[in-house]
Amino acid sequence: MYVVIGASGNTGHVVATKLLNDNKKVRVIGRNSAHLQPLTSKGTEPFVADVTDASALAKAFHGADAAYVMIPPNITSPDPLGHSNRVSDAIAAALQKAGIRNVVALSSNGAELSSGTGPIVGLHNLEQKLNQISSANVLFLRAGYFMENTLGQANAIRQMGSVASPVRPDLKLPMIATSDIGTAAADALLHPATQGKQTRELLGQRDISYNDVVTIIGKAIGKPELKYVQVPGDQFRGILVQMGMSGTMAKLLVEMTDAMNAGKIHALEHRAAQNTTPTDYETFVAEVFVPAYRQQAAA
């Protein structure tokens, strides 16, 4: 039995689907049974639980051989790091109680740092807590910058006529599709090779900048003149709050961006076959961004 946290999300859905396709028994954990229905209809066992509830998670993990764990985002929380720490505490306690032997945990570039990285601090804390479970083999997948983070640009292009972000336009980022993270996690669960605690970075197909993003998106949507605007952090924070994010979460995201711009958050591994994933940004734009952009334009 395999257990997947965040199964209705971008990475967890892929993990669960890959495991099912390999004819494995899969238990999926989510906050809402309706969100789990697409996977339940394919044969997974649903388990509705609050991820801050260690007792409930221990029941969900009971009898399982391996688990995929992550901290589901909660962008409206007034205390995002406090929330992520409660999730980490619950996951660690539940894994230990259930005696799970093999664990794959979603983390991030920059998780080696204990402060100054915005929400990534929560992933640092998750790693520290899972490191204390002596009985479990844990693989931390430290992923790069999600390509999905650029989906919000569809609205920016429609409203402002440009791509806008506080990220430096020339900053090369290891952008990765979340589907590739899910595939890597599923493979690690199906073919466990971790002894003790290990870290593996996932750096996408190549490093690209927001200047590259603008060029690729502009070509794909028929706007080759599309420009990039670097937005000041304070202005960006206000935009995020307008969109429904808590002020604290918006502040943390600006802190993360500042750390990226300063070179504080970066890959520790040299790019190699093991940390390079197949989906390039051009494919992501064609298959994910352009449909989202057109759907917004038609709304």
Model region roles, listed by residue range:
Residues 220, 234-299:
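A hydrophobic C-terminal alpha-helical subdomain
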Residues 1-27, 31-38, 52-55, 62, ...:
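Oxidoreductase cofactor-interface core, primarily capturing Rossmann-like NAD(P)-dependent enzymes
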Residues 84, 88:
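Aromatic/hydrophobic pocket-lining residues that form the small-molecule binding cavity
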